[in-house]
Amino acid sequence: MTPAPIPTEVLGALAGTRPAPRSTQALRAAIHARRMLLLKSLLVRTDRQRGLLGPVARRDFERAWALLAAAERTGPAEVREVLDYPTTGTWLAAALAAPQGAAFERQLAHLAGVAVAAAVRAGHTVTGTLTVPTGLLVLPGLGVLPCPSGRVRLGGGPGGTRIADDGGHAEAVLPHPAARPGPGASRATGDGTGWSALRTLPGGTVRLDDLDPYRTPPPGTGPGSLRAADRPDCPWGTWARRWRRARELLTAVDGRRAVETGAVLRAVVPLAAPDTGATPMGATLRSAPGAALIRLPGTASELAESLVHETHHTKLAALDELVPLCGPDGSAVHRVGWRPDPRPVPAVLQGAYAHLALTDLWWRVRSGAGADPAWRRRAGERFEALREEVGQALSLLLESDELTPAGREFVQGMERHHAGLGVTAQNVL
């Protein structure tokens, strides 16, 4: 599946960081096209290396693939939600990179959980048994079930889909789609002994994903190897309150931005507190757009800023699937104001884009009548410095020969929006 070329007006709207439904739709299409390409690549690799797979791994993969295809016929939109869930992307990247042998077979086994999640979401009846070699059945976007026996039994009934460890250690009943809570409900989906369900943050459909093993690639990501926090270290009440307040703050100063954040993000992944030293508050994985990896900020306004920042990392990662913005093999590195280490041009572009969105937000916060007073003071103190740093980064980008024609057009659009916030890009001598 190849997404349609991006219209010039959509590229221009994205460059300005301002929310637009048409832009969001184009980016979602790009994410799905990329996900389908990776899934097809996994199928092709598995088919070509059939003779190198063990008989159990090959059989289980074929069964899981058949279940996924059947679920797609029942509910294509619901299956798409599972395939486009951020951790599915992290898994696909890990599976395609795994060396042939036991490591690859372990990655292939995860397709069973993806297929079961798709069937549950689509309301497709699922029966039979599945092998779970890791001892943990992971249903992306839904939850996890421990399976010490290494096998699960599946069955349908009036209450929904029943999943049980073959040794009787754990079970879950996941309700049919019509029986699930709607958007904005914070209670978890499903019930049962040993079942741990993902929880939905208040006021929307974004999950607080503190369970999925693929929510960060091992051994972590980013400077200092940022680690995902496990559920015992993720206080649900604090996250829910801070999330609700952050959304209220965003809505008061920039309602469109609040809506966009809820539409682009699919999950928030809590990060563990660092052992020592300062580390970034958030991150976005290129393989998992739509997931904001965030260490719980001290205030709701800081969380609101992190959400806007990570939303724009997702937007740019998805846009780059539609139209490459930087050429290959660039070796030059540059200093930017928000990082202590030199960055290559693609990273400068990512940082400049996310910080331009943050500059736009602070511009509205400091002048908005509905802004929280403490947040208005913070925005006023930091706006000028960040505006200057973004301007310098835009100048570096425009002087670089590593941008593609579309990338140059995009950065010029960023510069125009930056100028509208009160300053033009600085000339670098």
Residue ranges and their predicted role:
Residues 313, 317, 321, 360-367:
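Short, well-ordered loop/turn and helix-capping segments at boundaries between secondary-structure elements
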Residues 259-263, 267, 324-329, 368-379:
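Short, glycine/acidic-rich hinge or "gate" loops at secondary-structure transitions
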Residues 268-288:
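Catalytic zinc-binding patch centered on the HExxH motif and its immediate surroundings
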